[in-house]
Design a protein with these regions (language model features):
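Aromatic-Pro/Gly-enriched surface loop or interdomain linker
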Residues: 31-94, 276
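Short alpha-beta junction capping motif
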Residues: 45-49, 91-137, 240
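Solvent-exposed loop/turn segments at secondary-structure junctions
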Residues: 52-55, 84-87, 102-107, 127, ...
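Catalytic beta-strand/loop cores that center a nucleophilic Ser/Cys/Thr
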Residues: 149, 154-239
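Bacterial N-terminal signal peptides
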Residues: 11-25
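N-terminal secretory signal peptides that target proteins for export/translocation
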Residues: 1-8
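Extracellular ligand-binding/catalytic regions of CAZymes and related secreted enzymes
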Residues: 32-44, 69, 73, 92, ...
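Boundary at the C-terminal end of the N-terminal hydrophobic targeting segment
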Residues: 24-32
Length: 280
């Protein structure tokens, strides 16, 4: 049935709409402000940064979500950003910066933003770098030295034999899994090994004889395997703060395992200077 919209009916409907708008707008605005509130009282201890300057893997957002959902395991609030400006504005309020596959940061971050990260780390901030966070970083000398190496090539998503460094057997990020174990991930080859660098401690290596270390794409481009000494997770305690890197984190499936969760949760707590979750 079609009813003609008379002037009086139109005024009535308009008045009703204005009343509804007046009463609902403050609530909606307040909810939005609360959702995006970045005041110190509403910030957590961990900032997951997922900005990228080069290739951006489609699973980066899913990984940020996965990391945010580790808050209960971590016993720490986790915030997420991909805005480089946040590294200047709010980084100093956090204990840990997680670099979620942040490729080629020199192309993404300006000098002021890079300096903010350097000063924050020198003052004791902890950095946890995942997988592609060591891709194309050589133009940022400070970060390249902090990480110890850069990207060369990688494998397909394959099962491989992972070996725990004997000196690291009790470290909370790798403990409880014996001297070696099988694990499936995308394994990265670096342009050098960090073994023996002062201040670095290798936690895990991958046995290249247990998988094909260079996938076909990179074989055609001259990609090289690392050989017998292929670190895949390590620490660096040089420079004031703590640094942790792991090759895991190409996508969620490489982390959504008991070991993957332990590895990342304990890495973040270690970077924050906190005791392992197993400690009372």
């Amino acid at each position: 049935m079609n009813q003609k919209l008379t002037p009086s009916l139109y005024r009535l409907l308009l008045t009703a709409a204005l009343i509804i708008a007046v009463h609902t707008q403050p609530t909606e605005v307040a909810a939005a402000e609360k959702k995006f509130d970045r005041s110190p009282k509403n910030l957590g201890s961990v900032l997951v940064f997922s900005g990228t300057g080069w290739y951006r893997h489609p699973e980066v957002p899913a990984l940020s979500g996965w990391l945010a959902r580790r808050d209960k395991d971590l016993r720490m609030q986790v915030d997420v950003s991909e805005n480089p400006a946040d590294l200047v504005k709010i980084l100093n309020r956090y204990k840990v910066l997680v670099l979620n596959n942040c490729t080629e940061m020199p192309a993404l971050l300006d000098e002021k933003q890079r300096q903010a990260v350097e000063e924050w780390h020198a003052a004791g901030g902890g950095i946890v770098a995942l997988h592609a966070a060591l891709v194309r970083q050589t133009e940022w000398k400070w970060f390249n030295e902090l990480a110890g190496c850069d990207f060369d090539s990688d494998s397909e998503f394959l099962e491989a034999r992972v070996v725990v460094d004997p000196a690291a057997a009790k470290h909370p990020t790798v403990s409880g899994h014996g001297t070696s174990f099988k694990y499936t991930a995308d394994w990265t080859n670096h342009d050098r090994s960090v073994s023996g660098i002062k201040g670095f401690q290798v936690l895990l290596r991958v046995d290249e004889s247990s998988y094909e270390p260079v996938r076909e794409l990179f074989q055609k481009r001259g990609g090289k395997a690392m050989g017998k000494d292929h670190p895949i997770a390590w620490l660096n305690t040089n420079g004031g703060g703590r640094f942790f890197y792991t090759e895991l984190g190409h996508d969620v499936r490489s982390l959504e395992t008991p070991f993957g969760k332990q590895h990342i949760v304990e890495a973040i707590r270690w970077a924050a200077g906190l005791k392992p979750t197993s400690s009372k």
